[in-house]
UniProtKB/Swiss-Prot annotation:
Family: Belongs to the RNA polymerase alpha chain family.
Source domain of life: Eukaryota
Keywords: Chloroplast, DNA-directed RNA polymerase, Nucleotidyltransferase, Plastid, Transcription, Transferase
Keyword Transferase: yes
Protein name: DNA-directed RNA polymerase subunit alpha
Annotated stretches, region: Alpha N-terminal domain (alpha-NTD): 1-233
Functional summary from the UniProt entry: DNA-dependent RNA polymerase catalyzes the transcription of DNA into RNA using the four ribonucleoside triphosphates as substrates.
Cellular component GO terms, alphabetical: chloroplast; DNA-directed RNA polymerase complex; mitochondrion
Reactions accelerated catalytically: RNA(n) + a ribonucleoside 5'-triphosphate = RNA(n+1) + diphosphate
Length: 339
């Protein structure tokens, strides 16, 4: 983290992407600014985003490989240049992009002699390879070579104890960290009581998502951490008991919606997030699992789409309708609501 003094000031809080580039298929770079911030706020935001970007962003990777009758991971296979351990290390480096949840199966089945690359992996429909040229192994003889793989979406660094599995499968230390590196710096501007801070944030990703997408997901994760405080009343604590301990947010959904109604261009539904709709924790979590993050996402769904969501009930549908009816103009509901 670097702190410098610079001249200049801004009047309204805003963020902006000032630089974005693709260095390679597996290296994306983005540079962002957020300003103006009061003294100390830039450090608070920078530290929180750094932790969220490096530890809370989900990634997809190969977590297990099954070779068949291989005694241990240091074995060599006739007709293959690499050892089993080297193949496992190569599989660990494969960068995948997906929105899957849970474990999925994949496989490789080829005939030599030839080079095996990531392009040879047979994947489920929900998964794609970022760089198909990543090497896996070199078959030097005309042999049939097959591997069964497991793919999982997770976060952080996952390790498993090394042991010989009777079915010939071996765990791969999963690195589910799309953000490869991150740096933030703070610049001070203004004089006297008008002094503000500007936060610069640099993000490098592995290509499975862009720096802008990573920043969005990290921000959403941080918001999710504080949602239980906003839904304290639902957990059995009355508002009367909490009103002296809890200050409602300055910019509530209703106030923001009122401002948006004044916009002649109409309500930007993609700027209203579902956590602003005062939904119950249960309904909110159901929508989040279905990748419904904004009001635009919600209003584009039919009743059938919502009922197909795992654990979604008719009571949730009624709760959503009552909430939207409470906050949105009735003509907007008639025009936009699909259910």
């Amino acid at each position: 983290m670097v702190r410098e003094e610079v001249a200049g000031s801004t009047q309204t809080l805003q963020w902006k992407c000032v630089e974005s580039r693709v260095d390679s298929k597996r290296l994306y770079y983005g540079r962002f600014i957020l300003s103006p911030l009061r003294k100390g706020q830039a450090d608070t935001v920078g530290i929180a985003l750094r932790r969220a970007l490096l530890g809370e962003i989900e990634g997809t990777c190969i977590t297990r490989a099954k070779f068949g009758s291989v005694p241990h991971e240091y074995s060599t296979i006739a007709g293959i240049e690499e050892s089993v351990q080297e193949i496992l290390l190569n599989l660990k480096e494969i960068v995948l992009r997906s929105n899957l949840y849970g474990v999925r199966d994949a496989s490789i089945c080829v005939k030599g002699p030839r080079y095996i690359t990531a392009q040879d992996i047979i994947l489920p429909p929900s998964v794609e390879i970022v760089d198909t040229a990543q090497p896996i192994a070199n078959l030097t003889e005309p042999i049939d070579f097959c591997i069964d793989l497991q793919i999982k979406r997770d976060r952080g660094y996952q390790t498993e104890l090394r042991k010989n599995y009777q079915d010939g499968s071996y765990p791969i230390d999963a690195v589910s960290m799309p953000v490869r590196n991150l740096n933030y710096s703070i610049f001070s501007c203004g004089n006297g009581n008008e002094k503000h801070e500007i936060l610069f944030l640099e993000i490098w990703t592995n290509g499975s998502l862009t720096p802008k997408e990573a920043l969005y997901e990290a921000s959403r994760n941080l918001i999710d951490l504080f949602l239980p405080f906003l839904h304290a009343e639902e957990e059995g604590t009355s508002f009367e008991e909490n009103k002296n301990r809890f200050t409602p947010p300055l910019f509530t959904f209703q106030k923001r919606l009122t401002n948006l109604k004044k916009n002649k261009k109409g309500i930007p539904l993609n700027c209203i997030f579902i956590d602003q709709l005062e939904l119950t924790s249960r309904t909110y979590n159901c929508l989040k699992r279905a990748n419904i993050h904004t009001l635009l996402d919600l209003l584009s769904k039919t009743e059938e789409d919502l009922l197909r969501i795992d654990s979604f009930r008719m009571e949730d549908r009624k709760h959503i309708w009552d909430t939207l009816e409470k906050h949105l103009p009735i003509d907007l509901l008639k025009n936009k609501l699909s259910f």
